[in-house]
Curated annotation (Swiss-Prot):
One of its GO terms (molecular function) is tryptophan synthase activity. This is Tryptophan synthase beta chain. PANTHER family: TRYPTOPHAN SYNTHASE, TRYPTOPHAN SYNTHASE-RELATED. The gene is trpB. Belongs to the TrpB family. It comes from Methanopyrus kandleri (strain AV19 / DSM 6324 / JCM 9639 / NBRC 100938).
């Protein structure tokens, strides 16, 4: 299972390091630090204690009995929405903040879309005494004002990025510029399984805890493995996080659900696995949404955290290999999933996670899941941050 990435950071034809020469030493330093930390039991002991006492792991695997009754299959929710801060993001930020410690870096920078990764970085920085600066697209700053306020409360400085499309892609560009200027003192804490090697590998290793716990929990609850696992996919850290420990279990179907926006037949979506082509984005070769001139296409999703024109190289590889199935759910369907989980279980999912929730209904309708099949949905985050967007879309004034 640990075949990939290879020593050059490739997953098949995807991955690698497409960055300015000036960044190479920092990436090599990071790779060396991680290789060393990965073999050090003390590093994992410290991280596991933080996961346990600060993040609140392990998260429960919850049997959604009302939703199950409604859909005719057994639906379990991996409750990453219960992690401190409200999403799976903290699993990774705590790990990388500890790595920054090992490298003697006292300043951390990060990009954020929905604000969840920015928030998780601000939390890890506050907990471990680091100076934190966050780059966030101006449009996202507007959409997620309360997350910006929370980051600032935790001592982080938030830079609204007004360049380009003013979303996640541009925030990443600005963060990379900052890093190039401040390599000595600064660790760039990337929030997903994207970017140049070793990031896709590092982030996967810190998010694997989701799948490890799930495997143990579902075996205990059901006496075996699930028939399917479903996770929403933007960059892909929550999906690879839950999929990874099941890759060798061929009988478990793995579904990566992308943001279909206003439909794959429009230009307003963020489904790079479904509709992208091979290209280079933010330092790695992967599936990218681009126009006929190879320019990155503007993306759209009701869920800010899925609004990204690329995807992790490992997921692109696994889809090509046929181990993971990529599909998409539209804004409208995600909204239905959002309402459905609230109504049946009293659980408010993030709009990102609502894509995965609704997809189970699609699988049942298509006959890809039979009555009584067991499916695990990675509930990657909670929806407090999305109440305003959802209310607006549902025609309710708050």
């Amino acid at each position: 299972m640990d075949r990939y990435p290879d020593e050059n950071g490739y997953f098949g034809e995807y991955g690698g390091r497409f960055v300015p020469e000036t960044l190479m030493p920092a990436l090599e330093e990071l790779e060396d630090a991680f290789k060393e930390a990965r073999e050090d039991p003390e590093f994992w002991e410290e991280l596991e204690e933080l996961w346990r006492k600060y993040a609140g792991r392990p998260t429960p695997l919850y049997y959604a009995r009302n939703l199950s009754r409604k859909l005719g299959v057994k639906v379990y929710l991996k409750r990453e929405d219960l992690v401190h801060g409200g999403a799976h993001k903290l699993n990774n930020t705590l790990g990388q903040a500890l790595l920054a410690d090992r490298m003697g870096k006292d300043r951390i920078i990060a990009e954020t879309g929905a604000g969840q990764h920015g928030l998780a970085t601000a939390m890890a920085g506050a907990a471990l005494g680091k100076k934190v600066e966050i780059y966030m697209g101006a449009i996202d700053v507007e959409r997620q004002k309360h997350n910006v306020f929370r980051m600032e409360l935790m001592g982080a400085k938030v830079h609204p990025v007004k360049a380009g499309t003013q979303t996640l892609k541009d925030a990443i560009n600005e963060a990379l510029r900052d890093w190039i200027t401040n390599l000595e003192t600064t660790h760039y804490l990337l929030g997903s399984v994207v970017g140049p090697h070793p990031y896709p590998w590092i982030v996967r290793e810190f998010q694997r805890v989701i799948g490890r716990e799930t495997k143990e929990q579902i075996t205990e609850l059901e006496g075996g493995l699930p028939d399917a696992i479903v996770a929403c996919t933007g960059g892909g850290s929550n999906s690879i996080g839950i999929f990874y420990d099941f890759l060798d279990d061929e009988e478990v179907a793995l579904y990566a659900v992308e943001a279909g926006g206003k439909g794959l037949d429009t230009d307003e979506h963020s489904a790079s696995l479904c509709a992208g082509e091979v290209g280079v984005l933010h330092g790695c070769r992967t599936k990218v949404l681009q126009d006929e001139h190879g320019q990155i296409r503007p993306t759209h999703s009701i869920a800010p955290g899925l609004d990204y024109p690329g995807v992790g190289p490992e997921l692109a590889f696994l889809v090509d290999e046929g181990r993971v199935t990529a599909d998409a759910v539209t804004d409208e369907e995600a909204l239905r999933g959002f309402v459905m989980l609230n109504e049946t279980e009293g659980i408010l999912p993030a709009l990102e996670s609502a894509h995965a929730v609704y997809y189970v209904k699609k699988l049942v309708e298509r006959g890809e899941l039979d009555r009584g099949d067991v499916v695990v949905v990675n509930l990657s985050g909670r929806g407090d941050k999305d109440v305003r967007i959802a209310a607006e879309e549902l025609g309710v004034e708050i």
